[in-house]
Amino acid sequence: MSAIENFDAHTPMMQQYLKLKAQHPEILLFYRMGDFYELFYDDAKRASQLLDISLTKRGASAGEPIPMAGIPYHAVENYLAKLVNQGESVAICEQIGDPATSKGPVERKVVRIVTPGTISDEALLQERQDNLLAAIWQDSKGFGYATLDISSGRFRLSEPADRETMAAELQRTNPAELLYAEDFAEMSLIEGRRGLRRRPLWEFEIDTARQQLNLQFGTRDLVGFGVENAPRGLCAAGCLLQYAKDTQRTTLPHIRSITMEREQDSIIMDAATRRNLEITQNLAGGAENTLASVLDCTVTPMGSRMLKRWLHMPVRDTRVLLERQQTIGALQDFTAELQPVLRQVGDLERILARLALRTARPRDLARMRHAFQQLPELRAQLETVDSAPVQALREKMGEFAELRDLLERAIIDTPPVLVRDGGVIASGYNEELDEWRALADGATDYLERLEVRERERTGLDTLKVGFNAVHGYYIQISRGQSHLAPINYMRRQTLKNAERYIIPELKEYEDKVLTSKGKALALEKQLYEELFDLLLPHLEALQQSASALAELDVLVNLAERAYTLNYICPTFIDKPGIRITEGRHPVVEQVLNEPFIANPLNLSPQRRMLIITGPNMGGKSTYMRQTALIALMAYIGSYVPAQKVEIGPIDRIFTRVGAADDLASGRSTFMVEMTETANILHNATEYSLVLMDEIGRGTSTYDGLSLAWACAENLANKIKALTLFATHYFELTQLPEKMEGVANVHLDALEHGDTIAFMHSVQDGAASKSYGLAVAALAGVPKEVIKRARQKLRELESISPNAAATQVDGTQMSLLSVPEETSPAVEALENLDPDSLTPRQALEWIYRLKSLV
């Protein structure tokens, strides 16, 4: 029989626990008992495994011992962090009644629910990464997707049209928690993701969603937010907002608006492209040697998060980009002065979210005060910068002199971690608080004087006055001198080496101290809550200030990077094309111990595709990726690593670079490669930048070459995308002769004996050979194997002197022109003697031949 079925047989306290647990059956319940959070029954067993804590038993209830595990309240943040990182959610149940006045168990209630996507506590968050809660909805017309960063109030929705776009969004946003409807059809799209939460269908109803959102924003309709005609996105947003409210158990005043993210506003990159370009995560899953690792020297966590959002959503609006470029140029002479001051601002964005949720701690308010104290100097430094966008940011960041003054008066310089510890509110802020503190301090002084007086009066040098939470104040005398205690000393406690006593005078002062300390602490908590009430009316302006400071941090950082790393300002042109002079790979040039070989690139409507040949390790992939990264950097407004760059409009960036088996989905390397290729051929346009590396290598030579040729033809002739096409199929170097807008380039290498030197420089024309054996030798393949390979190569070349192609009718026939296999029907006819057939046999042969066709 389960605990809940045998409800009446339990003790009153366990009945209270079981009622609360029944409201949160799917998640762990932290049940506050004194100085511990306790977990019982299955929760205790689960927590014991997840947190590696002891599983014990507590007495008995309903005749059965109760499995129990507990954690001390002061260490709860560490344990919550571990659980959240494992995708768990926790309901925090606190004592809200007074034990002194309670009849039966102290009243308790769940005050908040901590989930991976709704955390705002500093200890639980990674400071330089967004932590998103997301919801996904699907109907016959496509998907709806909404994300919320509860630690900043940033609320977004979109309507991905197809599965590929939805997959790219999931990869870009990487939510910590994902809500989905119970009838969600495309489970393979989200399986294996962390923090999956199945929600009932009614939470996704469109009318409920509109009502929820209008109530949150205080509006009559959603037209002003530009989301009125996005029903699928609104369904997801409604569910998400309801979940956030349910878990936080409070209003969410910092969520003030919702924004529609449209495909046409940014350069679209699918999941494979984001992975291959290693924007914020390398192929091994780490953060080293990524584009963000080079570009992100921001000095505030909120600036770092904003830069990563820019990198994952490059904007197509050249007006915004030119404004950013102009700002970066204007700030280059001011970075050394601005960055140290900006560093002091800290993570104002997340502090404001905790303020809105009323969970901000004393040190949060101290940091907010410190941020306000930087504003006058920042504003003074920016005043001399000749740039309209910079001046707009300066105005947006505000001054908040009154709030700064309030916090300077209210909070001590270095407050304790928690307000319940007391000593947070500064002296002089509140007269009544000062009076209670003076009483408590005065009584403490008296007790010190009492100790000196009694020691002198009794002549007992081991006598001292002390305090503990159970017995209150006492006079302690060592066991050796206890027989000399005066007659008016009343024994209170006996210890191994000492006796403790009380006298009426001490008891009187104990009452006074405890009363004054209790009154002071209660008043301090009240004053602290009132500070929230004084700060929250300014929340909108404060959030705008935090946003402006984060943007300033990003732009100052990009200005510093441009100067330090010798980047130049790219020029935007109207027609499709990319012209790069002396381009460099932003990441590779930072990790090389030798100078990076810069290379040019020229793509235009008249030169749409480059067929890139050259040896493995020659630099083909680096050359292709650097082109995409330079384009990406240009479209976040950054300066770029080159001598000169002109870049036209780009709607999408695709990369088909490298592949591995997708064992989880049962897809081979070749299947993964072809799926990514199909996505490109279906979605690329003349404004797309396409990187194709080694198409067709996952299958037989003829099949692979055929596919590579057909893909290149389609991209060059039909789609007309700007394409870099790297290949080892030398037959493809004939494409420029057969099609307009295609050109050959190659990466150079020099071979000397058994060694090879990679020049890493891009030259016009096709490569003369692939240097495969030299690369194999360089990789350490045994010499006898290399020697045998050379023999075999000479044999093959002697059979087909022109290795790649054979001359037929004066034209060059590539491997594509393989003689067609003889039809079985033709073979059968050749072996047939019609003169020897009877009429019946002839009829049978007609049917047989028909079946062979």
UniProtKB/Swiss-Prot annotation:
ATP binds at residues 614-621. InterPro entries: DNA_mismatch_repair_MutS, DNA_mismatch_repair_MutS-lik_N, DNA_mismatch_repair_MutS/MSH, DNA_mismatch_repair_MutS_C, DNA_mismatch_repair_MutS_clamp, DNA_mismatch_repair_MutS_core, DNA_mismatch_repair_MutS_N, DNA_mismatch_repair_MutS_sf. GO terms for cellular component: cytosol. One of its GO terms (biological process) is mismatch repair. The keyword DNA repair applies. PROSITE patterns: DNA_MISMATCH_REPAIR_2. Keywords: ATP-binding, DNA damage, DNA repair, DNA-binding, Nucleotide-binding. Pfam families: MutS_I (PF01624), MutS_II (PF05188), MutS_III (PF05192), MutS_IV (PF05190), MutS_V (PF00488). SMART domains: MUTSac, MUTSd. GO terms for molecular function: ATP binding; ATP-dependent DNA damage sensor activity; damaged DNA binding; mismatched DNA binding. Gene3D superfamilies: 1.10.1420.10, 6.10.140.430, DNA repair protein MutS, domain I (3.40.1170.10), MutS, connector domain (3.30.420.110), P-loop containing nucleotide triphosphate hydrolases (3.40.50.300). SUPFAM superfamilies: DNA repair protein MutS, domain I, DNA repair protein MutS, domain II, DNA repair protein MutS, domain III, P-loop containing nucleoside triphosphate hydrolases. HAMAP family: MutS. This protein is involved in the repair of mismatches in DNA. It is possible that it carries out the mismatch recognition step. This protein has a weak ATPase activity. NCBIfam families: mutS1, PRK05399.1. Belongs to the DNA mismatch repair MutS family. This is DNA mismatch repair protein MutS. The lineage of its organism: Bacteria, Pseudomonadati, Pseudomonadota, Gammaproteobacteria, Enterobacterales.
